[in-house]
């Protein structure tokens, strides 16, 4: 049986602008898990998820209790792994004919000298109105940036260097478990064992995981059903197949597609195995080459 690493898009957990309630997340997860469950019957499956809204909410809750020093961001990432991993595991385990589902709290090594620490760009937390920027920055010391028509907090997002728990993940996969891991991009730590005040991009973490466990494929799921040429224009066209070199211009694109293209291209070049970008609702068609974008050499 082949091994797939699947990175869930944020819409699998929460739709943009939705309240960060457990009820909303369970409802979205319930829509996502049937397709994942079908995959789990044909592949050894490692599932990576994001945590941007959730870790931002935990940070807000953390700041609200003034009598305790706020927890650092790496601890909050670990908390979000437990919360989201539990929700996904509960929903997946309820699907018929599911193999065992296990959540692994995952640490990922980053460099303390990564230039991302000097230029925070990773969105976390709920969305705000642009006119709230000055008050939020003054109240919390945050850095804020526009995310579409909304405003969100940004934090450092260093490059993942090594997944410290990959051996455990690989062992569980070989034993037939569906493994939920590298949640929120993994808990960022440095080589001296210290946690790091950052959030790692989950697509880059998924690509690194696929490399380290020698997965047979990497699937990055997103709101868009493929990578498009001339996106948003009348002549837009879905790209069904491309090499990493052909997709290179898209790695510099604004928005969320750039990191996804960077992630899949790095994996394909490193391992020579295919990767796909597509929509969760069409994941089986994407793997069959009937939807999405396949990236290979």
Curated annotation (Swiss-Prot):
UniProt KW Kinase keyword: yes
Subcellular location: Cytoplasm
A single GO molecular function term of this UniProt record: carbamate kinase activity
UniProt GO cellular component terms: cytosol
Catalytic activity: hydrogencarbonate + NH4(+) + ATP = carbamoyl phosphate + ADP + H2O + H(+); carbamate + ATP = carbamoyl phosphate + ADP; hydrogencarbonate + NH4(+) = carbamate + H2O + H(+)
TM helices/strands, residue ranges: none
Alphabetized CDD domains for the sequence: AAK_CK
Matches recorded under SUPFAM superfamilies: Carbamate kinase-like
Keywords of the record: ATP-binding, Cytoplasm, Kinase, Nucleotide-binding, Transferase
Highest taxon above the source species: Bacteria
Enzymatic class: transferase
BP GO terms, sorted: arginine deiminase pathway
EC number: 2.7.2.2
Protein's name in the database: Carbamate kinase
Protein encoded by which gene: allK
């Amino acid at each position: 049986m082949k091994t797939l690493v699947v990175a869930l898009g944020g819409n699998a957990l929460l739709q943009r602008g939705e309240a960060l309630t457990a009820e909303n997340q369970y409802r979205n997860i319930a829509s996502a898990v049937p397709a994942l469950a079908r995959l789990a019957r044909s592949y050894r499956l490692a599932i990576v998820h994001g945590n941007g809204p959730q870790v931002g909410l935990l940070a807000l809750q953390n700041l609200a209790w003034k009598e305790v020093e706020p927890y650092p961001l790496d601890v909050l990432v670990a908390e979000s792994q437990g919360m989201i991993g539990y929700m996904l595991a509960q929903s997946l385990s309820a699907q018929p004919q599911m193999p065992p589902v296990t959540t692994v709290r995952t640490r990922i090594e980053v460099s303390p000298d990564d230039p991302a620490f000097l230029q925070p760009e990773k969105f976390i937390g709920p969305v705000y109105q642009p006119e709230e920027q000055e008050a939020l920055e003054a109240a919390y010391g945050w850095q804020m940036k526009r995310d579409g028509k909304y405003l969100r907090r940004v934090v450092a997002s260093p490059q993942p260097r090594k997944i410290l728990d990959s051996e455990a993940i690989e062992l569980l996969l070989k034993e037939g478990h569906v493994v939920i891991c590298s949640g929120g991009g993994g808990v960022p730590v440095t080589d001296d064992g210290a946690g790091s005040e950052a959030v790692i991009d989950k697509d880059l973490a998924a690509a690194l995981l696929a490399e380290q466990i020698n997965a047979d494929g990497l699937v990055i799921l997103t709101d868009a059903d493929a990578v498009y040429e001339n996106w948003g224009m009348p002549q837009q066209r879905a790209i069904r197949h491309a090499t990493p070199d052909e997709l290179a211009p898209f790695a510099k694109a604004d928005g969320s597609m750039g990191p996804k293209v960077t992630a899949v291209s790095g994996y394909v070049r490193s391992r020579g195995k295919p990767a796909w970008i597509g929509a969760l609702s069409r994941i089986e068609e994407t793997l069959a080459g009937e939807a999405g974008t396949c990236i290979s050499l």
